[in-house]
Amino acid sequence: MHERMAVPSVETRSSWTVATVVLVILALSFGAPWITIIALKPIAAELGGLRSVPALATALAWTGFGAGGIVMGYVAERAGVRTTVILGAVMICVGLALSTGGKTWQLYVGQGLFVGFLGVGGMNAPFYVYVSRWFDRRRGSALALISSGAYVAGALWPPIFERAVAYAGWRQTMLYYGLFEVIVIVPLAAVFLRSPPELPLRLGALGALSAPNTVMGWPPSLVFGLIGAASIFCCIPMAMPQAHLPALCSDLGILVSHGAAMLSVLLGTAFVSRQFWGWVADRMGGLNTVLTGSIFQILAMAAFMFTQDEIGLFTVSAAFGLGFAGIIPAYVLAIRELFPAAEAYWRIPALLLCSGSGMALGGWIAGALYDHFGTYAPAFAAGVAANAVNLAIVGALVLRQRSRAARLA
């Protein structure tokens, strides 16, 4: 922290204006995949009856925007984030239109390639890099704010989509939403997404803990690989309630509208608590925040295994949202703390590819296990096991970081 105070800050009122606009754009772009989640049962009924089909489409969207973030992050570094965001908005619209075609392959390509890879992929990872360059002192809080876009989308859109699907069908809902997000995102990007200020050249916040060409005394590739693996294993359980909560409620005889409201509660509490986790991350550091959030997540995930009533599920959903919300931005903050700023444009998208792959895998595993067992209990058990692996990896990194700091103190 002393090193941060030794140079002038780049943070201004414009920094927070940009972060707020980015939050709005992400809340709109992340709305697109939620249509498939809310309409999981009717889409499955029209495409062969297997829930793993729309679950895989959602998984492809998660994987797509993770992989697309690497490619589009490279494009944004050279052509500007405004270009990738405008392109992404148009591609989301195209992908939603293609998904309504009635064929399984159209759903997969529409969600995976257009909505995921070219659409959200052109916004999510490039925005993390872009916004991190507008901040130096409250970077954790800013990253927490923009990373809440997915949770604003999850809190806002499921009840709206549930009513829209019931009234007009999932196809019309996709078509109209695609047009709406283009009409809103393109002007916002054109007006507000200008070049960020130049950051002073300096070491990361934890640079003193690393010798040249090492991170915490380990090879950078090893540390980055461990962080990436940890993000995969933490996002497998993270995705399961988000992707299958409405369907779980329907199976238990709970109204679909209540299931959508439950999802909104989960993601609404995640949005609120993520701002708190950002404040914590600015003080504890990225890895310590990841470890703390992962402990809360595994406890809430275990509670899903033993909860069957509506009030209990609302309570567990809120607890899950409060616990897991700060994990992803804390991973990004850890990357900015541990690695050179010049490497952010590819390390952050690569990290988000890992986390997105974990989200994709978690959503698909839950659907596949449900199709095999006829219940979600095995899926939640698998989620708890994956979370335990995550805790082991992050715990090892935190212990290494603390021992290194103690040795240099």
What spans do the regions from the language model cover?
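Extracytoplasmic
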Residues: 17-51, 69-72, 157-158, 240-246
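Hydrophobic core of transmembrane alpha-helices in multi-pass small-molecule transporters
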Residues: 27, 95, 106-122, 232, ...
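Extracytoplasmic gate region of multi-pass secondary transporters
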Residues: 36-40, 222-275
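Conserved MFS/SLC helix-loop-helix module at the cytosolic interface between two early adjacent transmembrane helices
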Residues: 67-105, 281
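Intracellular juxtamembrane helix-capping segments at the cytosolic ends
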Residues: 121-135, 326-339
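Helix-loop-helix hairpin linking two adjacent transmembrane segments in secondary transporters
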Residues: 149-197
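Symmetry-related core transmembrane helices of the 12-TM Major Facilitator Superfamily/SLC fold
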Residues: 174-191, 378-396
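C-terminal transmembrane helical hairpin of 12-TM major facilitator-type secondary transporters
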Residues: 264-276, 281-334, 351
